[in-house]
């Protein structure tokens, strides 16, 4: 188990985040295709499927997590809808976008977090 022996909520979230970020390759396609289990088995997924996996893993160990959605401008110039995860840690929501190794728990570097269009948060991703 990835979080065995880890006690703090933040450290558990970080361990799960790093697993998905570092072990699940990014693949470009729209909407959820594989879901959490399929993404884990295949070892790759888009933002939706990577988020599905991370949220499922978080909830399986008792962490509170949800899906965040928006239209984001990436550092590559791509301007597109995107999905990432938010963990509830220490009384606040902390971002977690596992689609880039440049990102860390609470820090997104692969798209402009100051100019995205918020499209809401979800307990269950609608697509």
Residue ranges and their predicted role:
Residues 1-45, 53-55, 120-127:
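Secondary-structure boundary elements
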Residues 7, 31, 46, 103, ...:
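Detector for Asparagine
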Residues 49:
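Short phosphate-coordinating micro-motif centered on Lys-Gly-acidic
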Residues 52-127:
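Hydrophobic/aromatic-rich core segments of domains that either
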